[in-house]
Amino acid sequence: KFAEFVSETRSKRTASREAAAPKTDLLTAQRANSKPVIVLDPGHGGIDYGAIGVGGTLEKAIVLEFSKLLRDKLSEGGLYQIHLTRDDDTFIPLGERVQIGHDLAADLFISIHADSVVRGKKLARGATVYTLSDRASDDLAEELAASENMSDIIAGVELEEEPTEVTDILLDLARRETRSFSVYFAKTLIGELQSAVRLIRNPHRSAGFRVLKAHDVPSVLVELGYLSNAHDEKLLISEEWRERMADAMTEAIHSFFRPRLAGRDGAVSQ
């Protein structure tokens, strides 16, 4: 009966999409001619400090400052609509961050962090780009996702109910296509970062980050570096390093949206 119910639900969704095809085509055309919507998500905030560096640097402060710098660079040329999930020292629950991206019909969601992770005796170091996956790519990714997913608990926020099995199946179908765009952007971003800043070994990793679970918005989580490493902390508070990092991320975003922006005034060239 469960299988029949899932099949029936899928059929209804397919019929609904087909009935709405002309409207969907119109909306798709309108969106193609609109400015891409980018949501930048500075991690943590408010009561949730995030990581604290060996020299006392607060993750919640450094990622907010960097997000504002990246926003300003992306604003040049007027190519995008850019939103921050927070622009001050405010705590935003993980589910609400995801919902912000969905409500804004974002074309790209970038969560920005600078965590503290220790693997045995080796301190993680270097920028890392994470995408969503059901199974973590490695122990570090698993540890980091578990830490990030505790954010709401730290702030005393009640965890949201998990979706029903049927709903989860249907959402997973939608996530698969979105995930391919997320991976494509992650690879594009790493391609730009590798000539600008130090990257961790195997810089594209994946795990079950709650903040990346929007089924309809390509999403990545960028670790600028690791505050548990004194060398990374020094870079993270360096204005010159932040400029290089933001410039590389800006170019990656331009590359990602270049096909859509081709021919428009102010569009970036190859």
Locate each region found by the language model.
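Catalytic-core regions of hydrolytic enzymes
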Residues: A3-V166, R175-K187, E243, D247, ...
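Active-site-adjacent mobile loop/cap segments within catalytic or ligand-binding domains
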Residues: V118, L170-Q270
